[in-house]
Amino acid sequence: MAETTPEQPLEEIDIDSYTTESEVPVEGEYTSESMASAFGEPQPAAGLGRRKNAIARVRIVPGTGKWKVNGRTLEDYFPNKVHQQEVNEPFKVLELDNRYDVIARISGGGVSGQAGALRLGVARALNEADVDNNRGALKKAGYLKRDDRAVERKKAGLKKARKAPQYSKR
């Protein structure tokens, strides 16, 4: 059996002389994980949003605020001003109007669900573009949370999801 005692005594180590900070020089002054902080300018990013049965794949690139939704402008795709405002809310909260161009592909669902999916996709893309600066405001406004409400299924023996047929006592 091998001996467990070392042949030479261990050297005394002065613990006070060591620090937890690295001695490697850091390039640049930013401490952010995000690319925008590293370069100081808007960066392209992508996000996926879902709402009801709608799915929106969103890509944002630095630009002048142009929207392309399934190859059409925002005003053509969402003629209702309420839906246009809903989709623009993440930019308004971050005060980034006309700083990014948005390219989106939306499929499934209706108009309202598609607008909600697009808003979530835009918010996630903005979050990815600059996590440190954008995440707090987007999270506080509730734009990073998926709205998981969906249509309740119809149950057997009922006319709709909850509506029962008329009850007759006699």
From Swiss-Prot:
Provide the coiled-coil residue spans.
Answer: none
Instruction: Provide the residue span(s) of the region labelled Disordered.
Output: 1-47
Pfam families per UniProt? Ribosomal_S9
Keywords from the named record: Ribonucleoprotein, Ribosomal protein
> Is the keyword Ribosomal protein assigned to this protein?
yes
Q: Which InterPro entries match?
A: Ribosomal_Su5_D2-typ_SF, Ribosomal_uS9, Ribosomal_uS9_bac/plastid, Ribosomal_uS9_CS, Ribsml_uS5_D2-typ_fold_subgr
Q: Entry's SUPFAM superfamilies?
A: Ribosomal protein S5 domain 2-like
Among Gene3D superfamilies, the record links this protein to:
3.30.230.10
What superkingdom does the record give?
A: Bacteria
GO: which molecular function terms?
RNA binding; structural constituent of ribosome
One cellular component term (GO) for this entry is: small ribosomal subunit
Asked if the record carries the keyword Ribosomal protein, the reply is: yes
One GO BP on record is: translation
Name the protein family.
Answer: Belongs to the universal ribosomal protein uS9 family.
Q: Which PANTHER family match?
A: RIBOSOMAL PROTEIN S9, SMALL RIBOSOMAL SUBUNIT PROTEIN US9M
Supply the HAMAP family for this chain.
Ribosomal_uS9_B (MF_00532_B)
Q: What is this protein called?
A: Small ribosomal subunit protein uS9
- State the species of origin: Streptomyces coelicolor (strain ATCC BAA-471 / A3(2) / M145)
